[in-house]
Curated annotation (Swiss-Prot):
Any Pfam family the entry gives: OTU
Record field: pH dependence: Optimum pH is 7.
Biased composition (Low complexity): 89-115
Keyword Membrane recorded: no
Region annotation Disordered: where it falls in the sequence: 86-117
Protein name per UniProt: OVARIAN TUMOR DOMAIN-containing deubiquitinating enzyme 10
Gene responsible for this protein: OTU10
Cited PROSITE patterns: OTU (PS50802)
Amino acid sequence: MVSHEENTSIVEWFLGPHPYTYPPYGIEMIHEDDEVAVAHHHHHHQSGEYYREYEDHRSSDVDNDEIIARTLQDDFLQLEIAESNDYSHQNQQQQHQQEGYTNNYSNNNNGYAWNDQSPAVDYSSEWIGNDNDQDGRSDDSVNVFSCSSPSDTDEYVYSWESDQCDADGEFGRRLNQMVPIPYIPKINGEIPPEEEAVSDHERLRNRLEMFDFTEVKVPGDGNCQFRALADQLYKTADRHKHVRRQIVKQLKSRPDSYQGYVPMDFSDYLRKMSRSGEWGDHVTLQAAADAYRVKIVVLTSFKDTCYIEILPTSQESKGVIFLSFWAEVHYNAIYLNRDTSETELQRKRKWWRFGN
């Protein structure tokens, strides 16, 4: 088990004041119970939006220390490499068999090769945004790819709009099996004590393993939510300042949609959120979902909440991004392992540090 010093380092890693968080209207809460499966079904409509809360039921009894977590990540990497090699080997065998059959068929059928009519695969993407950035592309552009996009693409947003993308995955099956119950918005509690924070970290690690996610850790400098969003949207956490500006811009553009969930004067809230280092909350997450037209899935460490799903309120989502939320104080970007290339896994592995 982790020592007292390691536990302390985990908690002390995060800096900055505790944020107030008032979850807005486009949020789905998924709950987790340790013993009995509870199924309720009820929709609560408020301000034109739905609140849905799900119950999932799994025990959280895995050991959580640095060695096990890193070993788990190594296992993910080795599994990914092994599956990739096996898939490549199978493809080569199939290709050789197909080529042999095609040659024989062509010789006997006036040179006609039936496999030349293979269907074309469209890997096109859609860009969102119009302001020019220094790198020559749209400053607020987000590359949104479909489920069929190549896994080694540099920039993409996972798409949840098609059932076939997640139908074969454990994560998609778990989502489809959950049943909604009412959710009432509330302000987040206090920062948990050290012992509870360590327990939350253990619970989050278990859920990351259960849903087969890889975590990309970002600094705990007060900008973690915006860094995690930037990593998902632009594939670099360094664009967190731009993401913050876009979110504040969205908040300003629709004050009537957000100010009712802020426990202070809305103009003061906007000024606070405009400052670098100011913690993001569920209101800023909702604004991010609206501004970028994406669904945001937040895997949490809460005892009774497995994950939160935040939907754009006025437009159809163009894709989905994933974050983790630990002990009410820190966000990281997370990626489904099956959608991550070997190169991308190795890059994320360098980011994965504990107690820093």
